[in-house]
């Protein structure tokens, strides 16, 4: 099969207006860059192509600088614009996972609207991905491995080389006299993917010549079965998930465990989260969904937190504890912590008007020091005709989830609470 003509056919079906090539400088991505450069030269026979490349400098290898320089030379040769992005790798969950997370987050910054990320994954990579999913005990979703087009980390991804083997890419590279770099870490069999690539899969291919194609068929069967399950559950799923980061639990407890886990996996997939293990899903169901009514349960899943409130699950990021945070308001704008944005103040003859996000509150002027705090316990008078009430009850009446209550800016005049911006103000007792 001819690489160039095959990719040309694939591009005719692509809806993107631009393509951002993930370029490591290795064999696979160098072949990919060369193919797209050729397609750009054939533009009179194609819709105009907008092609850029991006190289992620992880800083993990002593050769990282030379790899970046090599990629720049390649792109100069092919007249394709290149972005070089340096990243810091968080090794908490392992170098592989940290590098992958850093890489995709960096790429996401540069990916433009109507542009697809193009990666050089090929058939041999597909087999490795399938085996890694098998090792983790993955279900249909994980065993579906990689698709030619998908969404990952919220980005559209195009993998035009999935139907080709590594030897086919090597043949093309030699014919085109391409130069590429070699990552020395690829020989380190302490990494699972390298162990499979260097030790296990060569023996399987030696025994069964078409082993990779058979794995690809199995992965496709898994994908089709998962799609069928999603189709059969789509109407029920829509009833539970009308807002992307919220999952309603009404009737959920009446379903079988298999149906519950399938619906939860659909919700997590909709939010582009990696699939949890069966043990994690069972823990989520038992410890969060079936927790006591008055509980405030939560479940950490990678860099997200699943919380329950009023018979719904909510997906949020992890939040910092702000209850001990006190900020003095000395200017007309205050930068709030933990990505809460800015609080601004405008004044007229008698009043101060506080703005935060889409909310505002008007308070009388004061000579007392003004501060912003988060979290409060006690009774307040939030309505002129009602007695003082416990603030917890007020939050409940306003249907504010517990984790949001300590993230709403509270305005204090001296040590007296005056307002929760956008939710209530405190009235004096006469």
UniProtKB/Swiss-Prot annotation:
Its EC number is 6.3.4.19. It is found in: Cytoplasm. The lineage of its organism: Bacteria, Pseudomonadati, Pseudomonadota, Gammaproteobacteria, Pasteurellales. Ligates lysine onto the cytidine present at position 34 of the AUA codon-specific tRNA(Ile) that contains the anticodon CAU, in an ATP-dependent manner. Cytidine is converted to lysidine, thus changing the amino acid specificity of the tRNA from methionine to isoleucine. Gene3D superfamilies: 1.20.59.20, HUPs. Pfam families: ATP_bind_3 (PF01171), TilS (PF09179), TilS_C (PF11734). ATP binds at residues 24-29. SMART domains: TilS_C. The gene is tilS. InterPro entries: Lysidine-tRNA-synth_C, Rossmann-like_a/b/a_fold, TilS/TtcA_N, tRNA_Ile_lys_synt, tRNA_Ile_lys_synt_N, tRNA_Ile_lys_synt_subst-bd. The N-terminal region contains the highly conserved SGGXDS motif, predicted to be a P-loop motif involved in ATP binding. One of its GO terms (molecular function) is tRNA(Ile)-lysidine synthase activity. One of its GO terms (cellular component) is cytoplasm. This is tRNA(Ile)-lysidine synthase. GO terms for biological process: tRNA modification. Belongs to the tRNA(Ile)-lysidine synthase family. Its main location: cytoplasm. PANTHER family: TRNA(ILE)-LYSIDINE SYNTHASE-RELATED. It comes from Haemophilus influenzae (strain 86-028NP). It catalyses: cytidine(34) in tRNA(Ile2) + L-lysine + ATP = lysidine(34) in tRNA(Ile2) + AMP + diphosphate + H(+). Keywords: ATP-binding, Cytoplasm, Ligase, Nucleotide-binding, tRNA processing.
